[in-house]
């Protein structure tokens, strides 16, 4: 049974030890967001292709062909920190997309708004990934309904705002996006999981 070959270790070891196969060398190191005020975890990944393929396969199991979508991202604290598995994943989706308009946004909401309006006007299928607090701030300052855009909120207020329930998040986002176009995506750096 292969499960017996997997060493089970506490998540806390990713904060204090270099966890990798004996003799292995990392091709990429992902770092957790560290939003709990604690030391960030580090995941030393020997074969980043495994993460790339698993993320893409999961994405396409839900949304089908990534090539058809314009991929945008509003992930300010992740971009500023660097080494984020979430940023890596979204960047890979952008590379796979056949659409020319794609990109990450920090705080240029006017440019993001203009791009979304252009894409909406053309009926282009669009996915906007965003950390919850940034999506709420952006959409509440942006008084237009989006019909061709899917929102994937990546969770949390990241210490920027008071935490609110998932239902409250969906109620706020639902004022701007149809409920069936709102998704949640959460990952755990230590497990290379994005779901």
Map each language-model feature to its residues.
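Active-site glycine/GP-rich loop and adjacent strand/helix microenvironment
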Residues: 1, 68-70, 92-195
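Residue(s) in the substrate-gating loop at a strand-loop-helix junction
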Residues: 86
């Amino acid at each position: 049974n292969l499960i017996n070959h997997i060493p089970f270790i506490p998540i806390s070891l990713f904060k204090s030890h270099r966890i990798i196969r004996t003799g292995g060398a990392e091709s990429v190191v992902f770092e957790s967001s560290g939003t709990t005020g604690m030391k960030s975890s580090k995941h030393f990944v020997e074969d980043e292709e495994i993460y790339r393929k698993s993320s893409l396969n999961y994405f396409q199991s839900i949304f089908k062909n990534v090539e058809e979508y314009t991929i945008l991202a509003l992930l300010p604290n992740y971009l500023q920190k660097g080494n984020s598995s979430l940023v890596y994943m979204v960047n890979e989706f952008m590379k796979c997309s056949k659409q020319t308009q794609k990109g990450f946004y920090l705080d240029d909401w006017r440019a993001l708004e203009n791009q979304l309006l252009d894409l909406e006007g053309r009926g282009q299928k669009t996915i906007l990934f965003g950390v919850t607090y940034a999506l709420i701030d952006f959409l509440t300052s942006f008084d237009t309904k989006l019909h061709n855009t899917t929102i994937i909120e990546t969770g949390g207020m990241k210490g920027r705002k008071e935490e609110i329930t998932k239902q409250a998040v969906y109620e706020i986002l639902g004022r701007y996006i149809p409920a069936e176009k709102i998704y949640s995506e959460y990952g755990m750096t230590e497990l290379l999981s994005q779901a």
